Amino acid sequence: MRFGLNIDHIVTLREIRKTYEPEILEALFIAKNTHKVDLITIHLREDKRHIQNEDVLRLLEISPLPINIECSINAGITDFLCSLKNKPSKVTIVPENRNEVTTEGGLDCSLKGLGEVIRAYHNKGVEVSLFIDPLKDALHFAREHQVKQVEFHTGVYANLHNALYSNANNQIHAISALKDKSPKELKEELHNAFLQLRKMSKEAFFMGITACAGHGLNYSNVKELLKIPSLRELNIGHSVISKAVLVGLEKAILEMAQLIKR
């Protein structure tokens, strides 16, 4: 299983104060020196709430690890990434809403202009991945557009797992739709969410598409996904950075890697 580390929230801390620290390149090399991280993931948002264009340029210039850039189909973002001399190892196209706190679901594959953006990256020799819900129609869209990799949105699975097996439902930001569900209901829905991820990962494999997954994964809920043999990569960020605030980035990475790479 490949471990993709999302370091957006290193930059979130910097941007809160509009200052120079923490340094994203220091985070990059801490990750690299653990010898456990396979790629670095960043999300270049339209609103630039964390990662900036300059961060992209600096990372691509010196990173010893592959860089996966998440982005929308915004024309300005697409033009910027297609113009880069140093190319990312892949671009993962994600849905984006300026009012969202974080990505809320998989990509709408009927989105106008999506096919053109995929072709633009392919024409520049950049691998494309699509961040999708684990649905067959989305996989068929990927295959029709010669997309060789997808990342399944694991938010539904992760939220259900957290509601059932942690104190998430008692926290200030508890998900209202899950608070009133019984443990039996949560367990059944969690089981179904896992089965859907497993089924679509297998479907992707038979289509010749590499299946990755991410969103909301943490030290507790990630373990079950390791039982899906056709999943090849997990992208995890917020949970690792949250633990890093308390124990340090290196230790937080190593603890996650111990779970993923056992």
Curated annotation (Swiss-Prot):
Residues flagged as site, Transition state stabilizer: E151
Keywords, comma-separated and alphabetical: Cytoplasm, Pyridoxine biosynthesis, Transferase
Residues annotated as signal peptide: none
Enzyme class label: transferase
EC number of this enzyme: 2.6.99.2
Enzymatic reactions: 3-amino-2-oxopropyl phosphate + 1-deoxy-D-xylulose 5-phosphate = pyridoxine 5'-phosphate + phosphate + 2 H2O + H(+)
Transmembrane annotation, as ranges: none
Catalytic residues of the enzyme: H43 (proton acceptor), E70 (proton acceptor), H215 (proton donor)
One Gene Ontology cellular component: cytosol
Pathway(s) the chain acts in: Cofactor biosynthesis; pyridoxine 5'-phosphate biosynthesis; pyridoxine 5'-phosphate from D-erythrose 4-phosphate: step 5/5
Keyword Methyltransferase among record annotations: no
Residues at which 1-deoxy-D-xylulose 5-phosphate binds: D8, H9, R45, H50, T102
Pfam families: PdxJ
Compartments reported by the entry: Cytoplasm
GO BP term, example: pyridoxine biosynthetic process
A GO term for molecular function: pyridoxine 5'-phosphate synthase activity
Residues annotated to bind 3-amino-2-oxopropyl phosphate: N6, R17, G216, G237, H238
Superkingdom of this protein's organism: Bacteria
Role according to the record: Catalyzes the complicated ring closure reaction between the two acyclic compounds 1-deoxy-D-xylulose-5-phosphate (DXP) and 3-amino-2-oxopropyl phosphate (1-amino-acetone-3-phosphate or AAP) to form pyridoxine 5'-phosphate (PNP) and inorganic phosphate.
Subunit structure: Homooctamer; tetramer of dimers.
Annotated family: Belongs to the PNP synthase family.
Protein name as annotated: Pyridoxine 5'-phosphate synthase
Species name: Helicobacter pylori (strain Shi470)
